């Protein structure tokens, strides 16, 4: 199924509709924040034209009826605080779909999952309330458009890169990933790591959308602290970079976005947009970041007047103070949201919007439609050759009396696991990365030969995109994020019941575990929130504990490996093998559990493999039982 760029000239006729949808989104942002008195108006307002163009132009291939389709393009709101932007847009889109379904009864307008998956204007009244829509991006229920949970600075960027890698490695590089961020969030170090790695992996399907307005939270321009501009920030990393001078102009936004997204080549790309933080909100710059206008204040009503005059509507209580009772304030806000939605009384506009969303949704392929897709629809992770310790081959174990490090147990079971993938599924089970410590931590077993099965080798963007060991550098944070993004990418046509994708593994010193915690924490949340099946993230805490004492206390870390336990019950399994033969049984058993993260702590020095029978010890197979 070839993917061709939409015709820009044909799209231009729709820009008046896009402008109307964007104006409605602006009003939804303002009204929900006026009511809730919490949230982030500035960055939400500045990104409206980018989001409308992305979702209606065809640059992003997605289905509003089911955004979590396996081969849908992925959207990651790295600027996770800008959820009002997406909620407001979805409320407009879903209202058009609802009206067309009620008018025609045609199932093509029906949302998968019904009310539980439909974000309507009524839901805007629940912002930042318990059980309502979240203040930062969470991938669940009504907000499945978010491919992952985001909010902490930059955390979504490496995760998005991992998603792009999953599609590329599966032969589905035409499926794209879009990561929306501002230049403030972009200063986080994980962006530096992610940009290096995305270039090195040749992720031509990875797209940054950067909102550039020189403002953040504190009262100083970012240009006073950060040299250059987005063109330099991304060109210098080998990316394909294009800029938009007026980020509020639909023509310039759309033409530049399409030109950059559909360009050929394996360079990751960034499209940046020169915008005004707080555009149209009455307060611009840093002051618009995280505070709504006082409820029903004069400046709030001023932002409504322009819209009311433009579209000849009347807002309830216009110019008046906030109603005294909470119920009256809620009723007033609901009435005004309905007034915004009344623009969809224009049947031509409503039909255009709903039909355009359906048209784009219908373009999302199934696995059968995609030429060159490398994964079968069979879920190998249900294969007990991988998850039943009794099925592990004797060759992975060492004889009593041998001097071997625990990490060698990982090397053997890792090579065996991917040999099962080669033999049965013609693909690796696990894609691995390390912080320039692949051999040192023995995570390189995932790319090595096992028996008569040839290993998949090192990944190389030019010579071996089928490799199973990524050539990542000393980028612990982004390595963890990439592994989590990889493991969360379910390409199945039935993602709730079947997993088609990869497991991921990453390693560094156990004492540096804190560098990996942030992405793992969000992956744990995603696994809790999402109705879809996920893969596994295998967290190798290598060279762990005082056995690494020759590196001194800066490296052996008595307490920092405990970070792998900082998850809710049932979200992580920690493995601390006594000797190398315990690694295989314990790891296989853990991977067979319904737990998204498995943290394996291995040591570096050789230890003598015990003669368990002579010592009266139980079998190393008992390690599979856990503590």
Residue ranges of each PLM-predicted region?
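Glycine-rich phosphate/pyrophosphate-binding loops
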Residues: 63-64, 167-178, 488-515, 535
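Thiamine diphosphate
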Residues: 145, 149-269, 545-562
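Active-site phosphate/pyrophosphate-binding segments
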Residues: 133-134, 525, 530-627
């Amino acid at each position: 199924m070839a993917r061709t760029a939409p015709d820009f000239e044909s799209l231009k006729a729709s820009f008046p509709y896009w402008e109307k949808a964007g104006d409605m989104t602006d009003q939804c942002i303002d009204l929900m924040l006026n009511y809730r008195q919490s949230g982030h108006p500035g960055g939400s307002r500045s990104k409206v034209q980018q989001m409308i163009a992305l979702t209606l132009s065809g640059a992003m291939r997605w289905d509003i009826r089911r955004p979590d389709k396996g081969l849908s393009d992925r959207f990651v709101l790295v600027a996770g605080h800008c959820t009002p932007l997406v909620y407001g847009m979805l409320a407009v889109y879903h209202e058009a779909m609802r009206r067309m379904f009620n008018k025609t009864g045609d199932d093509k307008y029906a949302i998968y999952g019904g009310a539980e998956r439909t974000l309507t204007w009524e839901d805007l009244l629940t912002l930042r309330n318990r059980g309502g829509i979240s203040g930062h991006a969470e991938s669940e229920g009504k907000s499945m458009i978010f491919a992952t949970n985001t909010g902490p600075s930059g955390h979504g960027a490496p995760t998005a890169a991992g998603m792009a890698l999953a599609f590329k490695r599966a032969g589905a590089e035409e499926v794209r990933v879009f990561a929306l961020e501002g230049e403030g969030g972009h200063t986080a170090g994980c962006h530096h790591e992610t940009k290096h790695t995305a270039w090195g992996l040749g992720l031509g399907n990875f797209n940054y959308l950067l909102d550039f307005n020189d403002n953040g939270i504190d009262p100083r321009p970012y240009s006073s602290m950060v040299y250059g501009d987005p063109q330099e920030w991304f060109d210098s990393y080998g990316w394909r970079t294009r800029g938009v001078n007026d980020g509020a102009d639909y023509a310039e936004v759309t033409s530049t976005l399409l030109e950059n997204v559909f360009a050929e080549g394996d360079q990751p790309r960034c499209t940046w947009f020169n915008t005004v933080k707080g555009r149209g909100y009455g307060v611009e710059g840093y002051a618009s970041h995280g505070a709504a206008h006082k409820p029903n204040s004069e400046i709030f009503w001023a932002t409504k007047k322009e819209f009311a005059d433009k579209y000849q509507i009347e807002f309830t209580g216009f110019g008046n103070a906030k109603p005294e009772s909470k119920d009256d304030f809620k009723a007033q806000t609901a009435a005004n949201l309905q007034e915004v939605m009344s623009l969809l009384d224009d049947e031509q506009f409503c039909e255009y919007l709903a039909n355009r969303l359906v048209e784009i949704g219908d373009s999302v392929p199934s696995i059968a439609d995609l030429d060159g897709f490398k994964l079968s629809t069979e879920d190998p992770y249900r294969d007990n050759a991988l998850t039943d310790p009794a099925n592990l081959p004797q060759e992975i174990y060492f004889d009593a009396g041998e001097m071997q490090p625990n990490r060698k147990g990982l090397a053997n079971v890792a090579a065996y696991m991917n040999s099962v993938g080669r033999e049965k599924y013609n693909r690796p089970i696990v894609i691995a990365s390390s912080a320039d410590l692949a051999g040192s931590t023995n995570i390189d077993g995932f790319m090595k030969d096992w028996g008569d099965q040839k290993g998949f080798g090192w990944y190389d963007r030019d010579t071996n995109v089928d490799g199973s060991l990524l050539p990542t550098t000393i980028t612990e944070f982004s390595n963890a994020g990439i592994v989590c993004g990889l493991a969360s990418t379910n390409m199945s046509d039935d993602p709730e019941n079947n997993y088609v994708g990869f497991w991921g593994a990453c390693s560094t010193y156990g004492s540096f575990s804190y560098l990996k915690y942030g992405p793992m924490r969000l992956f744990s949340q995603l696994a809790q929130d999402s109705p879809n099946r996920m893969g596994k993230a295998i967290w190798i805490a290598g060279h762990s504990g005082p056995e690494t004492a020759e590196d001194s206390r800066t490296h052996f870390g008595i307490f920092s490996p405990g970070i792998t336990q900082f998850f809710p019950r049932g979200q992580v399994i920690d493995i601390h093998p006594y000797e190398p033969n315990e690694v295989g049984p314990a790891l296989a058993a853990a991977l067979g559990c319904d737990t998204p993260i498995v943290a394996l702590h291995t040591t570096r020095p050789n230890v003598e493999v015990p003669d368990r029978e002579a010592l009266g010890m139980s079998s190393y197979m008992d390690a599979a039982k856990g503590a």
